[in-house]
Amino acid sequence: MLKRLAREFVAANYDVKQLVRWIVSTEAYQLSSQYSEKNRIDDPAAGEMPLFSHMYLKSMQAEQLYDSLIVASNAHQSGNGSWSAQEEQRRRWMQQFVVAFDNDENDESTTFNGTIPQALMMMNSELIDKACSVERGSFLFEQMSSPGAETQKINDLYLAALTRKPTRAEMTKMQKALARYGNAKLNGYQDMFWALLNSNEFIFIH
């Protein structure tokens, strides 16, 4: 496939847009991350030679995770933060993952590999707090301010965080969880959104 793509790329006068169209149209690119009993053993993370029988899950890079949180929650629009304040927040976020290499070039690299400090940061950081806030402009503010049934609000939370609607079992579980909050439903929606943003399905690229 790579040889064919290379030939066609040259023949198309190095048209990058056309190359991207070809790549995303391939079966290899469109493979599901769901595995079966037959290809469960195909796991490079376990040291096996990749057979490309399904898409391999990988964690988002720090920049990707930051941008995904912003898009999912409108965290950059909550409150009255200025553009410079938002840039400073992004810089602080990225600084947590910068690893300096002790060599002549003073190289740096960013990592996000699920360490305990990183997991705690995802649970308690300023950005997560803003993502789950109900300040004016935030996603949750818009959701709570608009009319709609409980099931619709749960659907919207799933769509924002995971780009899919909840399964029937998930919907039932979330409704039962919300019922335990009584009249404090707002806290329930905040906790639900927090849980979705901290789920593996949100953090991993499928």
Q: What do the PLM-derived regions correspond to, one by one?
A:
Residues T167, M171-M174:
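Phosphopantetheine carrier-protein modules
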Residues K3, V10, K17, A28-T167, ...:
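An acidic, gly/pro-interrupted, aromatic-rich
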Residues M192:
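Globin-like tetrapyrrole-binding proteins
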Residues V24:
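Acidic, mature catalytic/reactive cores of soluble proteins
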Residues M1-A6, V16, V20, M174:
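Extended, hydrophobic alpha-helical segments in both membrane/secreted and soluble proteins
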